[in-house]
């Protein structure tokens, strides 16, 4: 039995997947603008342990982890180095994989990149705003 803390009910509860025998995990990944460090590794090591545990218990686990490969920090690093944001992202994604491989963290099944899903993200934000779950200020969208 796996017990998890439900932040909505503020109670520990027995884990039950939405679909019997299947578990889908989405983990927000790194923003690759610098070399990975222990703080980057912690969530991925944690999810790797959970994923392996669930698989050992017989669940079919699908694990997705994104890369925020376009971001102010990435653009600033690119400007400092005189290269493109994509070169910065690609370099540090490769460094991230190298570090996670050294820690024996299993790779996710899918690694979507923000740069490849921007239209979907914009549509989702518009939907959240239209439904009243987000609002816009002069400089930000608050969700």
Specify the residue positions occupied by each region the protein language model found.
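NTP-dependent nucleotidyl-transfer catalytic core
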Residues: 1-142
């Amino acid at each position: 039995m796996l017990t998890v803390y439900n932040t909505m009910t503020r109670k520990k509860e027995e884990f039950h997947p939405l679909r019997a025998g299947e578990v889908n995990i989405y983990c927000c990944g790194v923003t690759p603008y610098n070399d990975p460090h222990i703080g980057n590794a912690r969530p991925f090591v944690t999810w790797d342990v959970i994923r392996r545990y669930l698989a050992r218990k017989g669940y079919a686990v699908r694990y997705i982890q994104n890369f925020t490969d376009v971001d102010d920090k990435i653009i600033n690093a690119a400007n400092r180095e005189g290269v493109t944001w994509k070169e910065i992202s690609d370099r540090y994604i490769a460094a991230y994989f190298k570090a996670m491989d050294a820690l024996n963290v299993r790779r996710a099944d899918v690694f979507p990149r923000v740069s490849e899903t921007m239209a979907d993200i914009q549509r989702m934000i518009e939907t959240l705003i239209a439904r009243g779950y987000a609002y816009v200020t002069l400089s930000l969208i608050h969700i």
